[in-house]
Amino acid sequence: METELIRYIEREFHAKYYDITALDFSKNRKALKYINGVITKLTKPIFFFVKPDLGASMRSMEMEDVCYFILMRGEPSTSRELTEIAHEFGHLFYGEKGYPRAVVVNGEYANIERATIISNAVMDPLINRDLHNAGLDIVEYMQYAIKVQATELMFGYPEYSKLDKYQRNNIKCLIIEKIQEWDIIQNAIPNVFVEIADKKYKRILMESRNFVKRINATGTNNPEKCKKLLEMLTKENNISDEILIA
């Protein structure tokens, strides 16, 4: 059964199975400790796959009532990548606890990024705070994000007046996430995302700061609060008819 399941995922996602037990965690033992703590709380088996054309460096997914699996763009080896694996386990952990996630209404995999970035605005800081409290180096993790995401924010989008609603949603959710994450590390490094937004997208930056205030006022310590926040965010960003909070 397990072999058939692995082969099915390989075919469906054009990915290759990766044996996580062979991975060397000596570079990041705190990531391993966090993962070991989470994995005992998961009710389904988890598998790993390498998918070179993955739009993100990693993505955790669920085959309902059957298993979890994590897609990775490449075989992990660095300390930062091990932290990222721990982060994906965090998503699975909170999913088991009933925390919400955003899903595309029509279910098209091609549009999954629109849903993911909504979820990440609330859930990523929640998970990264856990990692930080567990002693993982999330500054290293965030510096990698700067290289990838800040460059896209600076050069990958047009001026504000030419943004479509999906681009505005992406930028706003990204800034909401990064403001919270820099609060976790007490601004130990410059928040390049805010600096770029202050130059290019002042209105979005203002909206993002206001939404972070709403997050802080509401709290994220239970699934209901997080669902309420994500529903407010989709409505505010004019995509509530396309993105469902489940």
Annotate the PLM regions.
Residues Y8, E12, K16, A31-Y34, ...:
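Charge-rich, solvent-exposed alpha-helical interaction surfaces
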Residues F69-I85:
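Short pre-active-site segment immediately N-terminal to the catalytic Zn-binding motif
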Residues E2-Y68, S77-T78, E113-A115, A134-E140:
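Auxiliary, metal-adjacent structural segments of Zn-dependent hydrolase domains
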Residues Q149-A246:
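Pan-zinc metallopeptidase signature
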Residues S79, Y94-P125:
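Post-HEXXH active-site segment of zinc metalloproteases
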Residues R129-Y157:
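Short helix/loop segments within enzyme catalytic domains
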Residues T83, H87, D124-P125, C173:
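Non-catalytic, well-ordered alpha-helical scaffold segments
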